[in-house]
Structure formats: C-alpha cells, structure tokens
Amino acid sequence: MAQYEHNSEKFGYLNLETLDGVQTALKALGFDPGKVDGKDGPNTQNAVRQFQAHATIKIDGIVGPATRSALMNELDQAQRAAGTSSA
C-alpha cells in the first residue's frame, strides 16, 4: 500500500495521492468539497481549509503532505471509533 492510501470497511479504498480520493475522504469526514470530480475548485479548497483548521495544521487550501497525513489520521480515528479495522 502506498504512503497515502487508506483501506477500511467503513470508508473502502481511498488513494489520498489523487484529488478525487482527497475529496471523497473530506466528504466522508463531514467536510463538503462539492462534487467529487478530481478538480481543485473553490468548494474543494474551502473544504480543505476547513479540514486544515479542524486538524490544527497550516491553513492554505493546498493538499500537501501535512494535509494528507492529517486526513489519514482522521480516517484511522473514525475507523477505530466505528469499531472496524483498517486493511
């Protein structure tokens, strides 16, 4: 599995190295990026900023390594809270 991939019963397979994977993760975590289309539009950037504020990381609207890592951590926490395991 690549560095920014998540696979679990709750969320399924998510590749956070792709923008549509990031959008799907944001949506699953309650941060609405709008349509999951792989495009870095204003809705996606806004959702990324909201997530970055939530994760207390640099708020810049850019999906870099810190944001991807924070998304992975948040997905893992939500997975554990749901009582199912990551694959």
Locations of regions flagged by a protein language model:
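Short beta->alpha linker loops
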Residues: 39, 43, 63-66
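Generic hydrophobic/packing signal
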Residues: 16-19, 47, 56
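Acidic, Ser/Thr/Pro/Gly-enriched interdomain connector segments
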Residues: 1-38, 42, 77-87
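Short alpha-helical segments in extracytoplasmic peptidoglycan/chitin-binding modules
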Residues: 23-26, 37, 47-52, 60
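Extracellular LysM carbohydrate-binding repeats and other cell-envelope/extracellular binding modules
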Residues: 50-86
